[in-house]
Amino acid sequence: MMKSQKKLLIKIIVVQCLLVLCVTSQDFDFFYFVQQWPASYCDTRRSCCYPTTGKPDEDFSIHGLWPNYKDGKWPQNCDRESSLDESEFSDLISTMEKNWPSLACPSSDGLKFWSHEWLKHGTCSALNQHAYFQTALDFKTKSNLLQNLNNAGIKPRNGDYYGVESIKKAIEKGVGHTPFIECNVDSQGNHQLYQVYLCVDSSASKFIDCPIFPHGGKCGSKIEFPSFSTNDDHDEF
């Protein structure tokens, strides 16, 4: 009797483990890969602080790689026991400092930001820490947003305004898929290019057409693409 109960218990545990693995690996439909324009983060009323590693380049930076459902909802914090382990991705840190900096105040080295992204989104991705961060870095290189915009004559310059559809078409031409453009408002009340959303398949292997676009962050027909190249010797923008 005890043996049969023991076997049954083992079977239940195995099934539960398999179910957990299944949910972890399949319980979302696609990723949003989100990049932000640093000038548009910094010139709002809340301002920003440059990382301890120095002012970032004038280029789009990674915000995150976020698992999502086709109904617009998303999973988050899928493993509350997880914690960021710097040793797991130590070979990526210098590249992440350049391409995935934190502009939040107070100034930081990025670890707090990366930890937030990993715990909230990465733990739902079915990727380990190294693969999660490496994948996001790879998609930034593939998307090449700034170059695609420059190729269309869309360059960061204060006071110039561009059509949102022109921005979308320039990115679509380079990436092959239509992005979602999120805007915010600068300290003078001007709408500006803030974040670009592209969609990635659930295996994190390629860009795809977005099953659904986010809500919020709507833009006018023309928006500013502010410069981030002005010299500034202060830590706070």
Swiss-Prot record:
Q: Give the EC number(s) under which this enzyme is classified.
A: 4.6.1.19
* Residues that coordinate or bind RNA: Q36, H63, F113, H116, E117, K120, H121
Q: Name one GO molecular function term.
A: RNA binding
Report the subcellular localization: Cytoplasm
Q: What domain of life does the UniProt record list for this protein's source?
A: Eukaryota
Q: Per UniProt, which keywords does this protein have? A: Cytoplasm, Disulfide bond, Endonuclease, Hydrolase, Lyase, Nuclease, Stress response, Zymogen
The protein's matches in PROSITE patterns, at most eight in alphabetical order, are given as: RNASE_T2_1 (PS00530), RNASE_T2_2 (PS00531)
**Any chance you could tell me the propeptide residue ranges?**
1-24
UniProt record similarity statement: Belongs to the RNase T2 family.
**Listed name of the protein:** Intracellular ribonuclease LX
